[in-house]
Amino acid sequence: MTLSRPSLVALTSLLLACSDRFTPPAGTLTGTFGGPNMELNFGSRIVQASRICSGAIFKGPVVPDANGDFVLPSTSMLGDFYSSIQLEIRGRLVGSQIMASVVMTGPAGTSTEQRTLTRGIKGDFSGYACAMSQP
């Protein structure tokens, strides 16, 4: 296959645009934090939250404030059954752990759970038939 010069220029421009050299801000939270029934994967552009049988994607980067506090604002959970449920996570980074308030709001109301997630630990979804896996 031979590309004409205009096609080659267009393809090169597209590739350069897609290879955005994004540099996350200083202090950006990265890595995996996990615990019982939950896992957070912080990247420079997105945060993936995995819960039993569902999860959510939040926009990144996440930069905790001077106290280590951050908020992952309310977003719809993934999956047909969970799509009417909103997930919000309010966290505090303390050393290698995140102390998180996990807020779920749906047709039945709002519930809040407290979770402690540890850096470098994957979420433990054992015992559940619909255990989440990394994409």
Question: Which role fits each region the language model picked out?
Answer:
Residues 1-8:
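Bacterial N-terminal signal peptides that target proteins for export
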Residues 15-17:
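C-terminal motif of bacterial Sec signal peptides marking the signal peptidase cleavage site
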Residues 21-39, 98-102, 124-135:
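Tryptophan-anchored aromatic micro-motifs
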Residues 35, 56-59, 83-88, 112:
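Short, surface-exposed coil-to-beta transition loops
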Residues 35-78:
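N-terminal glycine/threonine-rich, aromatic-flanked beta-hairpin/loop signature
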Residues 54, 77-83, 107-111:
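Short, cysteine-centered beta-strand-loop-beta hairpins and adjacent loop/turn segments enriched
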Residues 71-93:
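An anionic, turn-rich surface loop/hairpin at beta-sheet edges
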Residues 86-131:
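Surface-exposed, polar helix/loop patches in the mature regions of secreted/periplasmic/lumenal proteins
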